[in-house]
Design a protein with these regions (language model features):
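C-terminal coupling/interaction segments
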Residues: 249-295
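Generic alpha-helical secondary structure signal
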Residues: 17, 69-72, 110-113, 215, ...
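ABC transporter nucleotide-binding domain
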Residues: 169-257
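Short loop/turn segments at beta->alpha junctions
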Residues: 92, 213, 276-279
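Short, surface-exposed beta-strand/loop "edge" segments at domain boundaries and coil↔beta transitions
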Residues: 148-156, 231-234, 259-262
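Alpha-helix N-cap/helix-start and coil->helix boundary motif
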Residues: 11, 94, 190, 231, ...
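ABC transporter nucleotide-binding domains
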Residues: 2-7, 12-204, 209-210
Length: 295
């Protein structure tokens, strides 16, 4: 499997915050969700991927080239939407689009014009007078019209209404389908990523908690009702996130569950009474809680 982004043992520190041995592997052509609470290190990691910050150690490869050593050639092929857009407030939408186009030989004017119409952006309006949703649409337009191989999107739909989110996500999905591009998108909202991501990484307090295919995270997080389990258990074929007593039985929250793992309980003299699906948000909360308890 080729990767659009490879991060190995990345370290970074700013004040009291630290990224600790972060490793990520973003498959080429995927929509890769980067999930975590606010302040967990998602934005810092993305800025390191783009060469906007310098790491203390580790290795970053983007589109096959080393970052930051090959930053100019990488950034020519990457579209970026920051969490907070920083554009000249005194320019109109049209002036911003024209200015941006001058920096990218691959700029696709028909795409830009099509998105101006689809997003219903008034090209004579000052950036300062755009609503939050209009600013978000403009930033997505600028990223897509660059025709990059990789889009790095930092909380692009945070705080937007459902209609604007739908418009943006539809445009992104069409872009990936047409261009076979890769999207690396962050959010602190589980449901934002659940619907369309192929892969997901979860970050908390500067560490990667897990990195798995989205379907595996969705299908592999379960609540098990268990009877007769020993107090101390050894290695398990799944990840035990929590164990709690409830009405004479135990309720286990587990990750990386597969149906054939039921036989494990017979081997330890226990009975598996029930397997209950968890929605992704519940699984995410349990994953973070377990990670924090183990620190």
């Amino acid at each position: 499997m080729s990767h659009a982004i490879e991060i190995e043992s990345l370290r970074y520190r700013a004040g009291s915050f630290e990224l600790k041995d972060v490793s990520l592997h973003v498959p080429a052509g995927s929509i890769y969700g980067f999930l975590g609470p606010n302040g967990s290190g998602k934005t810092t990691t993305m800025r390191l991927v783009l060469g906007l910050l310098r790491p203390l150690g580790g290795r970053i490869s983007v589109l096959g080239d080393r970052m930051p050593e090959e930053a100019p050639s990488i950034l020519a092929r990457v579209g970026y939407v920051p969490e907070q857009p920083h554009l000249d407030a005194t320019l109109t939408v049209r002036e911003i689009v024209t200015f941006q186009a001058a920096f990218y030989p691959t700029w696709d004017r028909p795409v830009a014009e099509d998105l101006l119409r689809r997003f219903e952006l008034d090209d004579g309006k000052l950036f300062a007078r755009l609503s939050k949703g209009q600013k978000a649409k403009l930033m997505i337009l600028l990223a897509l019209a660059q025709r990059g191989e990789l889009l790095v999107l930092d909380e692009p739909t945070d705080g937007l209404d459902p209609v604007v989110r739908r418009d943006i996500l539809t445009a992104l999905l069409e872009y990936v389908s047409e261009r076979k591009a890769t999207i690396f998108i962050s959010s602190h909202l589980v449901h934002e990523l659940e619907r369309f991501c192929d892969w997901v990484a979860v970050m908390d307090d500067g560490r990667v908690v897990t990195e798995v295919p989205m379907e595996k995270l969705k299908q592999g997080t379960k609540r098990l009702v268990v009877s007769g389990a020993p107090t101390t258990i050894g290695a398990t074929p799944f990840v035990v996130l929590s164990r709690e007593q409830s009405n004479g039985a135990e309720r286990w929250i587990v990750g990386q569950w597969e149906p054939e793992m039921k036989s494990y309980f017979e081997g330890v003299g226990a009975s598996l009474v029930d397997v209950i699906d968890l929605d992704l948000e519940d699984g995410f909360v349990e994953l973070l809680r377990s990670f924090r308890e183990r620190r």
